[in-house]
Each structure stands twice: as C-alpha cells, then as structure tokens.
UniProtKB/Swiss-Prot annotation:
Membrane-spanning residues: none
Protein name: UPF0102 protein Ping_1176
Higher taxonomy: Bacteria, Pseudomonadati, Pseudomonadota, Gammaproteobacteria, Alteromonadales
Gene Ontology MF terms in the entry: nucleic acid binding
UniProt-listed Gene3D superfamilies: 3.40.1350.10
C-alpha cells in the first residue's frame, strides 16, 4: 500500500528527527538499547542508558510553533501512553532499573536539539 504524499513527507521528517536526536544523545554519552519500541499501548521512540539509568525518550519535531512548540504536543494523555508503554517494556526485564522520561525537540530553525531530562514523571 502506498502512503499519501503528505504522510510520506511527514513520516520522513520524523525519521530524520529521530536520527538527529539519536546522534545528539549518543554524543552526550547515552547508549541505545531500543528504537521504536511498539506494543499495544503505544510506542517509545528511543530507549537508552544514561550511566545506570534507563531512559525512555520522546522525540518531537515541529516545523514551526504555530500550535505551540514541540514540547507542547506531549500532553498528559501522551505522557500516560508513554508511561504505560514503558511499564510494558519493563516487564520484559529481569530487574527493574532506575528510569526516567526525557523529551528531545528537533526544531527546523535550530541546529541543536533541545533536550529535557526528567520531562515528566508517573
């Protein structure tokens, strides 16, 4: 099935934003564990290790801030979905590590991503 052109363009920008975010976070010393973890509850863009902490990362891209910046789109509903998906992932592990939820924004006007550690909590 072929995707509509607008959806293809939007999806490719999202993929590029995730690659840029991943590269930036690896430069900051984080190690990739999983990318695009899916389950019935939702998706987590990046799961990484920062020293001894497991980090669940939401990547946001916005071309402009007409409807709020990239972080404005991570509302309470989206946060609950990410937390529920993270709990599903944690059930696959033998031991539950320290965890945090980060957000990283890729803005078309900025060369450096904006990274918020502990962006939200359960």
């Amino acid at each position: 099935m072929k995707l509509p052109r607008l959806l293809q363009a939007s999806n490719s920008k999202g993929v590029l934003a995730e690659k840029q975010a991943l590269s930036y976070l690896q430069e900051q010393g984080l190690r990739l564990i999983c990318q695009n973890y899916y389950c019935r509850f939702g998706e987590i863009d990046l799961i990484m290790i920062d020293q001894d902490t497991l980090v669940f990362i939401e990547v946001r891209y916005r071309k402009n801030s007409d409807f709020g910046g990239p972080f404005a789109s991570i509302n309470k509903s989206k946060q609950r979905k990410i937390i529920t998906t993270a709990k599903h992932y944690l059930r696959t592990l033998e031991d539950e590590p320290f965890c945090r939820f980060d957000a990283i924004a890729i803005d078309s006007k900025s060369t450096t991503p904006a990274w918020i550690q502990n962006a939200f909590q359960e």
